[in-house]
Amino acid sequence: MSTYTRPVMLLLSGLLLLTLAIAVLNTLVPLWLAQEHMSTWQVGVVSSSYFTGNLVGTLLTGYVIKRIGFNRSYYLSSFIFAAGCAGLGLMIGFWSWLAWRFVAGVGCAMIWVVVESALMCSGTSRNRGRLLAAYMMVYYVGTFLGQLLVSKVSTELMSVLPWVTGLTLAGILPLLFTRVLNQQAENHDSTSITAMLKLRQARLGVNGCIISGIVLGSLYGLMPLYLNHKGVSNASIGFWMAVLVSAGILGQWPIGRLADKFGRLLVLRVQVFVVILGSIAMLSQAAMAPALFILGAAGFTLYPVAMAWACEKVEHHQLVAMNQALLLSYTVGSLLGPSFSAMLMQNFSDNLLFIMIASVSFIYLLMLLRNAGHTPKPVAHV
């Protein structure tokens, strides 16, 4: 049986369109808020509202899939995200956008969970890793193309919202021509998410996902604002964000190979150390291109390596619950990161964005170094 079946290819095609829309809004919303003369802490709170929606969406989607299946859950989540996009044009204001970004966050998280769960159920133990790798590549390529779009098209609010909403709805079309079946549903309800979060031997992976959420949530939510405060134009901001994301794309395959060859613990240590170096380099402002590149290459690949670490520590039938727990951990980090970073930037200096990223990374590095002699054999492979 082929790994990349027709339903899988159509699912990933729809995801690519949705990711384009998500990436464009994630870059432009902080800039639109700044243009409305909102304070830095308000920008951070709106970003956190989006990630709060992610948290709620992640918790709800399992129930939705069980009730209406993968296809209808995908349609519903796309419609919710489209509503969150269109709603931004109804009324411009802090409280209004706080609500609409929450709605968009719910829809976005539901899309992620539906697609990830569909791929898990479509695959086997032999090809599931390739399916999830394809998913991550599509996600990052879509994000990269979205950043390029920002640098090439008008960034005015009412110019962007119509085609972004249309792109979201177009992402539904591929799934109209296929049906994704849940062939292994009976194996997915045996383990609770709470049990996975409490699993001691997987704690490094869970903590890694939280740290990854803090780092990427802060970069996604506040890097455009940081560059804007430095006098960078909107078009150039899109370019620099594309540099950041492209580094994450290019880093996926080699870092994954290195983790398989030399062990995930060693690779995690090196990744976190490189994130610290990249953050320090950003403070100097002397070489932003290489600094952003190494930040992207190390930061964007931290989540999959930490996820693989945690998944090694569980039985095969627990993999889905563990993946859900890791996504929740990442979302919590994404929620905390922008809020705390925005408060520091508002009250002290924009440079504290990178000091905060370096600090939490250093704490995680200490956790990794404490486990120097603890390298248990893997139980499950995806």
Curated annotation (Swiss-Prot):
Record-linked SUPFAM superfamilies: MFS general substrate transporter
Molecular functions (GO terms): transmembrane transporter activity
CDD domains, per the entry: MFS_YcaD_like
Cytoplasmic side: 1-13, 66-78, 123-130, 178-203, 256-269, 312-324, 369-382
UniProt keyword list: Cell inner membrane, Cell membrane, Membrane, Transmembrane, Transmembrane helix, Transport
Gene3D superfamilies linked to this entry: MFS general substrate transporter like domains
Regions that span the bilayer: 14-34, 45-65, 79-99, 102-122, 131-151, 157-177, 204-224, 235-255, 270-290, 291-311, 325-345, 348-368
Record's keyword annotation contains Ligase: no
Subcellular location field: Cell inner membrane
Periplasmic side: 35-44, 100-101, 152-156, 225-234, 346-347
GO cellular component annotations of the record: plasma membrane
Pfam families in the record: MFS_1
PANTHER family named in the record: TRANSPORTER MFS SUPERFAMILY
Family stated for the protein in its record: Belongs to the major facilitator superfamily. YcaD (TC 2.A.1.26) family.
Protein name: Uncharacterized MFS-type transporter YcaD
Native source organism of the sequence: Shigella flexneri
